[in-house]
A protein has these predicted regions:
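Short alpha-helix
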Residues: 213-231
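Conserved S-adenosyl-L-methionine
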Residues: 232-244
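A short glycine-rich, Lys/Arg-flanked "PGG" loop and its adjoining helix->strand segment in the class I
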Residues: 145-157
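Conserved class I S-adenosyl-L-methionine
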Residues: 2-60, 75-78, 160-198, 241
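Class I SAM-dependent methyltransferase SAM/SAH-binding core
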Residues: 64-121
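A short SAM/SAH-binding and catalytic strip from SAM-dependent methyltransferases
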Residues: 131-143
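A short acidic, Gly/Pro-enriched loop at the edge of an enzyme's catalytic core
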Residues: 120-131
């Protein structure tokens, strides 16, 4: 089997997994939108794209934003709230169904176009977007360096890339992280069952993660090196982002894989 065939097979498994998770994942997004998450993430997003918004406004046009791996539409909604014309992509048809429904409820009439595609193979012309955002996506990339190159391709010169992610599933290759995870998650009641994966779904995701390249690297150091090698500028990272952005329950449950935030310019 060729490398391309292996990646295609893995991609199909990833798509099937997230189709199955669409409803429970959407439940979590709806909770965020209704509570702690929306204003907290909105504040961080608004601050991160403020200078880009100002520059676009001076040009007299609407800012174009790309939501990469949009899932049930959380960032699509926040970007629309910031006045952006949003394109949102996801490989899961069922996630896109939930995203459309959530957006229709949260930001009726907003300019959001949803597209089913691989986030590493985008159907957009080069230099199309002023900002591109992803959350909990990069770890899933079968060729993450190529994905970063693709995301930079579709950004306009001076455009901004925001990446929120964590060392998800590193516990599969690191015994210390695994011990910390088991301790954090000993009390499973701390996190809402209605938005969590089932035990069977979690095992399936572990099998997927075991085949993904970023499971075994140290991040965000890897990301910084790759982005700079690809020509991104003003690359910075906030490794304490989880303290500002996660709820107390998320911090308790996922503390062994803390969320980081990467900012970069094209």
């Amino acid at each position: 089997m060729t490398i391309a065939q292996v990646r295609d097979e893995l991609g199909a498994a990833i798509g099937e997994y997230w189709d199955n998770r669409a409803q429970t994942y959407s439940n979590g997004i709806q909770s965020e939108l209704a509570g702690y998450g929306r204003c907290t993430w909105q504040r961080v997003l608004a601050h991160a794209i403020e200078s880009t918004c100002d520059a676009v406004a001076r040009e007299g046009r609407t800012m174009r934003a790309l939501d990469l791996g949009c899932g049930p539409g959380f960032f699509s909604i926040l970007l629309a709230d910031e006045g952006c014309a949003v394109d949102a992509v996801d490989m899961s048809a069922k996630m896109l169904e939930r995203a459309r429904a959530n957006a229709a409820q949260a930001v009726p009439g907003a300019s959001i176009a949803f597209h089913q595609c691989d986030a590493a193979d985008l159907p957009f012309a080069s230099e199309s977007f002023d900002v591109a955002v992803s959350r909990n996506l990069t770890w899933l990339m079968r060729d993450p360096e190529a994905a970063y190159a693709e995301w930079l391709r579709v950004l306009r010169p001076g455009g901004k890339l925001l990446v929120f992610d964590a060392n998800w599933y590193r516990y599969l290759v690191d015994d210390d992280v695994d011990a910390a995870r088991r301790s954090d998650q000993a009390n499973a009641q701390v996190y809402d069952k209605g938005s969590r994966a089932t035990d069977d779904e979690e095992r399936r995701c572990e099998l997927i993660a075991a085949e993904l390249p970023l499971t075994s690297v140290v991040r965000p150091q890897w990301d910084i090196q790759v982005l700079e090698r690809l020509g991104a500028t003003r690359v910075s990272v906030n490794e304490q982002a989880w303290q500002d952005l996660w709820s107390a329950d998320e911090q308790a449950y996922y503390g062994s894989s803390p969320l980081f935030m990467i900012e970069a310019r094209k």
